[in-house]
Amino acid sequence: MTFSVQHAEIHFNRNHIPVSDQFNDVYFSNENGLAETDYVFLQGNQLWERWISHNEANFVIAETGFGTGLNFFAVTQLFREFRQQHENHPLKRLNFISFEKYPLKITALSQAHLAYPQFEDLSAHLQRYWPSLILGCHRIHFGETTLDLWLGNVSENLPQLGDYMNERIDAWFLDGFAPSKNPEMWNDDLYKLMFRFTKPNGSFATFTAASAVRKGLESAGFNVTKRKGFGKKRECLSGLKIQSKSTVLSTPWYLAQPAKMEKQDVAIIGGGIASFCAAISLVKRGAKVTIYCEDDALALNASGNKQGAFYPQLSDDNALTVDFYLHAFSYGRQLLDWAIEQNIEFEHEFCGVALCAYNEKSAVKLTKISQLGLPNEIFQMLSAEQLSEKVGLPLNCEGGWIEQGAWLAPRQFVQNAFSFLEKQGVIIKTSQKITALSQQEKGWELENTQGQKYCHEVVILANGYKITDFVQTEKLPLYPIRGQVSQIPTSENLLKLKSVLCYDGYLTPANQLKTSHCIGASHVRDNVDRHFSEQEQQENQQKLQQNIAQPWTQDVNTSDNLARVGIRCSVRDLAPMVGNVPHFEQQQADYYNLFNLRRRKQPIQSAANFQNIFLIAALGSRGLTSAPLLGETLASIIYGEPLPISEGILHNLSANRAWVKKWLKGSKVE
């Protein structure tokens, strides 16, 4: 398993232009890099003229070679000007997908940005959220423009856009170092993928006029035109996709399918963190959102704890799940920062998270995680002495340290964040238990326990373990897990705890009033009893005292019997679910013979799903970390926009994955 990439090695020439040591080429023109960007890419793709005639809500640009971000800054600024001049135009959002094999170090990035002070606000935001060296897609929001920065080799990352992105890209910035300097990137496989992902009448533009590039693009299917080059360059290329070619889907059983909407009217069933994260991503896209929560207040189930840990679920046995959580952790931090900037009040502390090697099994697991090559700010292995210093209390074991980890107050966060959304027009209906969904001509009818009915175009199920209460979802292999979290008084010793401490359970630092801590949680599968358990209360205390055999743990006292019980939703492989709700009976009919269909290379239909019903499910005990990226992914699917995750991760999160794995083996699904 490889999750990390390498930094670029560069120097600055006498014109203060960054130069790649790997490729011995400049990042942008010595003459006027911004003018070259404008001429080659913005004018070469006729962006302004095409935006004027564009009749969809979003426009997608893809780029090879992010470099310093100059092209991105220029097109973002141009799009801002377009939106200011055309406020009522159908085009509302710009998606910019860029691939970078060797990202700059933050110091080099900030130095390069000094050359373009007119982009100061954009460069400051990019520098703030400049990603760790984690392979794959990193989504960063810049108002109405969204950047998907894919780190790693474009030959590996571009295919990960997957079947979903077929014919969804409007324009290409074919950039990067010159073909003579970087021949590995400029190849026929790249051009074929570009053509596959480009919309009919979509375009490309590039600074080069190299014969091999022109022939490769023409062979892929583009109509290529030579135009005058920038500055001293004689010629450059641009082109269009005039005719489409049929493309065989590689994994039709996992194909994500957008919603069909006219009014952008979305109902979300559920009142916790998953519901909020879906809602905020939808609201940013202009959706009219209504929340249906069966409790008399929001965040009363699994999202209702006073303190919860925020850190990625790392393991040594499922690369795709680890990959998801690494990106979810980064994206989730952006959402928390956004909430703080919006003055949404919630207790929190970015204090780090310690993972204790409390027994032989956990020590082996953490050692294997340390061999994944993750950046130190994500994970590093520390000695018992080093970890004790981070934690603030003595430990008898080594362990992992997650520098960017945190704790926050989930119930306070969710309730206040929903109050913020209510002011943005989100309708919140509490004490509304939805019991049935019925498909109508233009959407779905929701019926509650009193027989009242509500109609919406799109429905999202985000109601935790009760997601299988509906006919449409009853076959999903989900199950409930009861978890009791204990609240304990602090002490002189416990006040020294500086970080979240994880073992076969967890202990948080003191809350902001410095009066109490949370310790938990029990884990009882297939149990939905919400009553207090004295046995589980004692077990929460005993697990800490047994795993961390230090005198200070005797201060932990659960005898006040202060606790709350939440019911989490989980699945056997421990990965969340997001996307379309699959139609089990129809997929069973289409795919029961999938093993033989593939072997014989026979045509295979795209997955049959319930139109306009989606879900976020199986968040388990990591909902604080996973929900923000899941919500953003789901909103992207619903609106048919580029996804912030790879095709591989999407497959690993698909609701029908357990069924498909059996069908692919020729096994029957009951």
Curated annotation (Swiss-Prot):
Cofactor(s) needed: FAD
Residues spanning the membrane: none
Domain of life: Bacteria
Disulfide bonds: none
Catalysed reactions, as listed in the record: 5-aminomethyl-2-thiouridine(34) in tRNA + S-adenosyl-L-methionine = 5-methylaminomethyl-2-thiouridine(34) in tRNA + S-adenosyl-L-homocysteine + H(+)
GO cellular component: cytoplasm
Keyword Transcription: no
Name the UniProt record assigns to this protein: tRNA 5-methylaminomethyl-2-thiouridine biosynthesis bifunctional protein MnmC
Organism, scientific name: Haemophilus influenzae (strain 86-028NP)
